[in-house]
């Protein structure tokens, strides 16, 4: 993606160099390596802008082509966070900036499969690898409807990420009101009624920042 093709201007200021990722692969065990035995430095390191990338949904380093996925939202959000303007964008839209932190590095962890599905094992593997890598922040623009306060075996992973010093940011969801997921149908509950259960999981967990 050309939005992520521009590398940070100060190589000494980046958190991860290619040598750093190589050292992690040599000294620690990632779920990525267990999912794809062919995982190596050259398959997960893309550039100083994207020092790590893995497709947890399909269990391989290959992300496929743009035509293979129904979920481009993560790429959109990554652009808002750390995207860089291309010369074409600058000329066509008269823009001076794109991402909020254009010098930031991106660790890309794909957790949606080609059908638009995301399962707990994808997420848990990705988050635990994020802990192993020692990332600063994790953004999750995802969630299941009417999330619980606690979900055994899942909540603990998010707690561990926060305890490791990772700022875990999760989208609150777009359900609007409880009736959206009601067994009785939307028409049985007025949208003006006081509602509950509108936050999605994992945004309901105590240890995350939900926006």
Give, region by region, the residue ranges found by the protein language model.
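Substrate-binding/access-modulating region of protease and related hydrolase catalytic domains
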Residues: 61-62, 69, 84, 108-207
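Subtilisin-like serine protease catalytic core
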Residues: 1-119, 133-136, 163, 178, ...
